[in-house]
């Protein structure tokens, strides 16, 4: 308050607290130029940092409990940001004055539109979903389905070059979202780039399961996913050796598949690439906050009723880890400013989440996240084969950015 008083009397004073680099909540000049809002901003930053440091200094907590306390304290602090409230956000106040409050009426309409009429769940729109259409301006690379079963369709994309690589390329996306993360727009499509390099690309497009697939296991995802794809690719191309890429949980499945194939002396995948893949779950980052026996049991009870985990529930978990960017920025834009979200292909894909079969997902969370069994030789058994990652001898490239 002393620095604010000095500024209000015409003096110069350095701010006591400033936002961290990358914090876009206070980017508008009003947060610094207006003495009142600068005071509100600095008071919030000082208080939130004090609260977080106080909680961090609590004694007697194990690392896991301390991580949970820190995580939820930060979510609490984010929710109380002055940028999230009409009276303390100068940008919203200006918009309200200029529009005569029309922004708040528009925001209420947006809020009602985002509320699920059946469940009451709030699904905050992150992008203009009407601006995108599968096959028109996202997932536009020309391909054909060459194989399908209960869990996936296999899509083939032919190379666009005169010289063609002999080995086909199999891409295994995660099944928590759709495959077209690899094929958003032509300018940022990995598939477009790969076929332009002479690769014959095959991509697994996972099914969005319902209760009929509740008993599907991780064994089934391996057998009916990559292993079924290998046979279909050989039938389509005549090539038995196939390079593979796994992304996120698709990469975890690729690691399981390679260990399974190594045990059976199956050499059809001579090289593997992993994009942002967890194999050792010892340090699962902030996701570990949601993994303990009590929370898993509650999750399993919810899944047992439906036969699957709703995609929106998984998406909400990931959004919480970046609350300012993936929750509160859209609350401000959609509900306080009354604006429609901006068209953004990546956020359209991010919102297009899929369900997960209860049996498979329970096994995955317990064996990977809770028990970290994948790194133990024989810790996980799929299709009767005890997996040992040490037996994987194929060249592997891993990228985690």
Where do the protein language model's features map onto the residues?
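Alpha/beta-hydrolase-fold enzymes
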Residues: 62-94, 235, 239, 257-361, ...
């Amino acid at each position: 308050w002393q620095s604010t008083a000095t500024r209000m009397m015409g003096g110069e004073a350095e701010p006591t607290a400033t936002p961290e680099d990358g914090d876009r909540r206070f980017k508008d000049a009003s947060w610094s130029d207006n003495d009142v809002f600068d005071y509100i901003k600095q008071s919030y930053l000082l208080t939130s940092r004090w609260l977080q440091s106080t909680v961090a200094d609590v004694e007697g907590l194990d690392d896991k409990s301390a991580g949970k306390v820190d995580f939820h304290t930060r979510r609490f602090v984010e929710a109380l940001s002055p940028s999230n409230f009409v009276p303390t956000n100068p940008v919203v106040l200006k918009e309200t004055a200029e529009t005569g409050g029309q922004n708040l009426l528009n925001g209420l309409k947006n809020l009602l539109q985002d509320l699920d009429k059946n469940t009451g769940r709030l699904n905050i729109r992150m992008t203009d979903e009407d601006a995108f259409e599968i096959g028109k301006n996202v997932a536009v690379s020309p391909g054909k389905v060459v194989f399908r079963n209960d869990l996936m369709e296999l899509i083939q994309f032919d190379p666009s070059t005169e010289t063609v690589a002999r080995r086909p390329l199999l891409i295994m996306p995660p099944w928590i979202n759709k495959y077209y993360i690899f094929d958003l727009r032509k300018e940022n499509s990995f598939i477009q780039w790969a076929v332009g390099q002479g690769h014959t690309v095959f991509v697994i497009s996972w099914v969005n399961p319902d209760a009929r697939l509740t008993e599907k296991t991780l064994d089934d995802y391996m057998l009916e996913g990559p292993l079924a794809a290998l046979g279909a690719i050989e039938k389509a191309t005549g090539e038995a050796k196939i390079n593979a890429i796994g992304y996120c949980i698709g990469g975890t499945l690729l690691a399981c598949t390679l260990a399974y194939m190594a045990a059976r002396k199956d050499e059809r995948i001579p090289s593997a690439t992993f994009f942002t893949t967890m194999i050792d779950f010892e340090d699962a980052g902030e996701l570990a906050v949601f993994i303990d026996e009590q929370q898993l049991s509650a999750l399993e009870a919810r899944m047992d009723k439906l036969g699957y985990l709703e995609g929106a529930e998984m998406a909400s978990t990931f959004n919480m880890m970046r609350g300012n960017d993936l929750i509160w920025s859209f609350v401000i834009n959609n509900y306080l400013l009354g604006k429609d979200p901006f068209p953004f292909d990546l956020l359209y894909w991010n919102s297009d989440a899929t369900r997960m079969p209860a049996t498979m997902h329970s096994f995955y969370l317990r064996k990977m996240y809770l028990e970290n069994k994948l790194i133990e030789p024989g810790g996980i058994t799929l299709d009767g084969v005890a997996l040992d990652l040490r037996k994987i001898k194929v060249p592997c490239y891993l990228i985690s950015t």
